[in-house]
Amino acid sequence: MRRVAPALFLLLVACSSVVLYERAESDTLYFGTGKPDGSAVTAAEWQQFLREEVTPRFSGFTHWEAHGSWKDVPEESHVLQLIHPPGHEADVAAIIDTYKKRFQQEAVLQVRGDVWLRLR
């Protein structure tokens, strides 16, 4: 029994340190800011879009400004990173469709992947 107890103890310690990750999906969306009339989506318009369209659908997200190009034309853009449980495809599609209509955009680039996450 004295030999089994240390082995059992080590097994319990090893099992207690197992870190569990949760499956999720990651959507990274790239929004161009150039409008057909030559103007650009303003910072205030972008913040309003986030407030009205993104925040009600996702409780947390990250966004940042970027410099990109579309069809060889450089333009400022916004990148939106969404990490969410599976099953939010309709919410992501609604955000994309609304942005395209509101700001007269041809397209929004969407990059999707499966991820494993945990909060530490």
Model segments located where?
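Short, glycine- and small/hydrophobic-rich beta-strand elements in well-ordered beta-sheets
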Residues: T55-V73
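Helix-rich interaction surfaces within compact, conserved domain-sized segments
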Residues: P74-R120
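Terminal, regulation- and interaction-focused segments at domain boundaries
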Residues: A24-A43, L80-I83
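Glycine-rich, aromatic-bearing surface loops/beta-hairpins
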Residues: V18-A24
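Short amphipathic alpha-helical segments
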Residues: E45-R57
